[in-house]
């Protein structure tokens, strides 16, 4: 198992000059089963923002290269990583997600994207989270909730999980629909504004030309 992990790491590292490149072939091994937290940038090589961010992201990867707690990685959504981008709902580039064990769903990173901000987040927020095997990482409130969920019937626990996931998915869908509606309204308003500018500009120019300039104080009319 250790040899397999080392092989996967070497192969992945060779595919990227900085961060390790993830694909469906190594994602489970390096992220979900590694016990590490993962900080992952989903990208497209042609994306301007991705190119701009690459030096800082690669520097971040170098900083955590030997870390036993945090993995810094890339997923190329245009090649072998495309199935992962689809699985985790990536719709724009770059999208940054983080996985704190035992979380397998991933969370969207919404912080700043400078090297200092990324490094601070990785140092302070990433690491193994609260779980049955890591009770020392749990707050008293988390321990109470965890016990409640452990004592719950498996069917009830599954039902509760699916309900929460559906509520979240429905909320995201509603948000996206509203966003599309707002974008359409914005475009319609912008089109009207541009048309008005186009129609008004020549009239305004002629009206200004037809309006005599104000006389300077003390000036006399020429005879």
UniProtKB/Swiss-Prot annotation:
Protein's name according to its UniProt entry: Protein disulfide-isomerase-like protein EhSep2
GO molecular function: protein disulfide isomerase activity
Compartments, record wording: Endoplasmic reticulum lumen
Residue span, Thioredoxin domain: 18-125
Stretches with biased composition (Low complexity): 203-216
SUPFAM superfamilies the UniProt entry points to: Thioredoxin-like (SSF52833)
GO CC annotations, alphabetized: endoplasmic reticulum; endoplasmic reticulum lumen
Pfam families according to UniProt: Thioredoxin
Any single biological process term in GO: protein folding
Chain spans, region Disordered: 201-223
Superkingdom of source: Eukaryota
UniProt short sequence motif Prevents secretion from ER, positions renumbered to this chain: 220-223
Keyword Endoplasmic reticulum: yes
Family: Belongs to the protein disulfide isomerase family.
Signal peptide coordinates: 1-17
Keyword terms, alphabetized: Coiled coil, Endoplasmic reticulum, Selenocysteine, Signal
Coiled coil location: 155-201
């Amino acid at each position: 198992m250790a040899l397999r992990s080392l092989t996967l790491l070497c192969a992945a590292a060779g595919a990227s000059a900085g961060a390790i490149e993830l694909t469906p072939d190594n994602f489970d091994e390096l992220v979900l089963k590694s016990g590490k937290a993962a900080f992952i940038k989903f990208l497209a090589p042609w994306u301007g923002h991705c190119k701009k961010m690459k030096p800082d992201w690669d520097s971040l990867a170098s900083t955590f290269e030997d870390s036993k707690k945090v993995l810094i990685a890339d997923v190329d959504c245009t090649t072998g990583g495309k199935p992962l981008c689809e699985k985790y709902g990536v719709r724009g580039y770059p999208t940054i997600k983080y996985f704190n064990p035992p979380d397998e769903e991933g969370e969207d990173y919404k912080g700043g994207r400078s090297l200092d901000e990324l490094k601070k987040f990785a140092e302070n927020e990433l690491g193994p989270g609260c779980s049955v095997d890591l009770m020392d990482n749990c707050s008293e409130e988390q321990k109470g909730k965890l016990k409640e969920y452990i004592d719950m019937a498996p069917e009830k626990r599954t039902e509760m999980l699916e309900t929460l996931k559906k509520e979240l998915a429905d909320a995201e869908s509603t948000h996206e629909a509203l966003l599309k509606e707002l974008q359409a309204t914005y475009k319609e308003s912008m089109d009207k504004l541009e048309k008005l500018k186009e129609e008004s500009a020549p009239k305004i120019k002629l009206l200004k030309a037809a309006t005599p300039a104000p006389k300077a104080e003390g000036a006399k009319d020429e005879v």
